[in-house]
Amino acid sequence: MNVDFLCSLPRAGNTLLGSIINQNKNLNVTANTILADIIYQLHLLKKNEIFLNFPDEKSLNNVIKNSFNNYYKDWEAEFIIDRGPWGTPDNLKILKSIIKNPKFIILNRPPLECLASYIQIEQPKN
């Protein structure tokens, strides 16, 4: 299994890209996953009183590093593009400690266009 990452603004074309790529059974783009949050919460355990009482950082790092394999264990695709908030500073730092050279797909759509697309779908039909 090979995991890469999709980080883009909402309404930038993530769903369209995912629906095109997901036509290939060997390649899957996820919906917005909770994996980034799972790994972040595991990382926060390093500040927990129970952990600090017996700081076995190596074992906790093993759990964190195996999160990707465990989360995607039942996925049949060889390549997975995880769509989540991996570009935030804390998530990116943790991700780089797990995967040395993570690869990102970033869809570039001007932020004002993304915002305008929200307004367009929320506008009353009258």
Regions found by a protein language model. Give the residues of each.
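Short amphipathic alpha-helical segments and helix-helix/interface helices
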Residues: 18, 69, 92-96
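PAPS-dependent sulfotransferase catalytic core
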Residues: 1-68, 74-75
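PAPS-dependent sulfotransferase catalytic domain
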Residues: 44, 79-126
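Residue-level detector of alpha-helix boundary/anchor positions
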Residues: 73-74, 101
